[in-house]
């Protein structure tokens, strides 16, 4: 039984709430730079290369006093970091579980007031910490200068992720740890699941995010004693920062109750006297020069206004495949970018009509990493622009204007598939034949990306929202505007997990490495969702029906997998087709990557060229993970490709290890 299911019946045992630390100082013991500043509890002040500690004066029971078993628990605390410089932090803050009240011999700077250079990494430390790190230390393998990590006995994080949270729609939102805003951290540990989850979110978010930022599957009982002290540490280096602690809550159960409070505003970092004088001087000089510069500014303004729409085509852009549109063309086509269709995975999407041809287009304004050069970015887009398949949304061209990038696609009038699945009651319901056709269209597109091109293309985000429907109810797979090409033999690793929860294969969370198998997993979930007419997760449904994959397998084991679909779908379908799609969906979404078929095999099964094995349920249940489709390949033709890509024909056998990989 999952942690989310158990939450519904867990009983409240104990609540220890230190609400508003500044009024509960008697329960805290301060060390180092920790104390009071501006009426708030702080772990550091303006002193450089210093650390502060604040620990509860009484230990917290982590193990049952009768049988010594580890107990489940949750912690919630609120903090804010106000840096000396708005764009540069110091070192960071950490939540700590320690065998002692306070940590003797701790060092500042990169050690966060927890460890030092001699005891870092010692198994005898028995310290568990959640770090909110604002400085990238290569010696500890830090991923960046704005991340959250789980550490055991040392400063090298076991798992870490860039600071952010998943909103109620499952979209990832970045957060800055040095924004000066109040942030909430929730730490939940289930002893039965042996799982530690960490979430980070803005304080104004009413609810804790449904999906954790970090998840560590590990039994913590060997690292914790019966009674341990809980507290916080922080440190500064050559750059100063004030680390504020505001509220914290401890629960011996894994429910996190809704908290109601007024969000405080923290004062800015105190400026040195020399800085104040400098600000006054700069202000005076600015005002003195303003009049003299005004005339020049007006001249420059009118000159730039005249040349506003002038765009220069650089020599290297001639090599790019897609057509380059002028900014003026797109500005006029979209009526000044006022016809907003929605927000895509990388930015807003606008509807437009090209003058002359009256062709309908969709224009996506791409938000991209500023560290990535425009030349490199356009090279990647030119690669995507050469994809040609009837079930892929076609990239018509691009526009580069003022360091912004606009991608131009065919406009599909019926919008995305999710509107048909979960739209209003007035929305036309899809028939079974339409659903089956959509599933086959998406399968064909994905098979082309995996097997039909000169590169292996990994989509990474298969879901109904990324499937668009044309006026004839044909489906096209979209939202693959940004990509990176990796040479043969390169083992891709990513510090940011891409995709949508529910459609992400289990191995993605462990390795962060997308593969064709992770795409197949997402497609399996997609098949179940479309064919059953149910969401992947129904929290209000009966417990056995709450998770769609589990419900489908239960129905299958009970003799009729078709019962997993809604009554409307069961009454309007070819039962044989529905049974085939459901079984194939369960197989594709198997937790073990080795069990899943490839997309070429999936297409053959959907088209009736090949059949599923008779003992498929045994394969799904089997703990011995083998490539069933390799054994089954005696009745399946070898995968070869003969696809037309513009004027290029590919007739050689396609092998995943023999081509570069393209990650979308």
From Swiss-Prot:
Keywords: ATP-binding, Cell membrane, Glycoprotein, Kinase, Lectin, Membrane, Nucleotide-binding, Receptor, Serine/threonine-protein kinase, Signal, Transferase, Transmembrane, Transmembrane helix. It catalyses: L-seryl-[protein] + ATP = O-phospho-L-seryl-[protein] + ADP + H(+); L-threonyl-[protein] + ATP = O-phospho-L-threonyl-[protein] + ADP + H(+). It comes from Arabidopsis thaliana. It is a single-pass type I membrane protein. Residues 28-250 are annotated as: Legume-lectin like. SUPFAM superfamilies: Concanavalin A-like lectins/glucanases, Protein kinase-like (PK-like). It is found in: Cell membrane. The chain crosses the membrane at residues 279-299. This is Probable L-type lectin-domain containing receptor kinase V.3. SMART domains: S_TKc. Its EC number is 2.7.11.1. The lineage of its organism: Eukaryota, Viridiplantae, Streptophyta, Embryophyta, Tracheophyta. The keyword Cytoplasm does not apply. ATP binds at residues 341-349, 364.
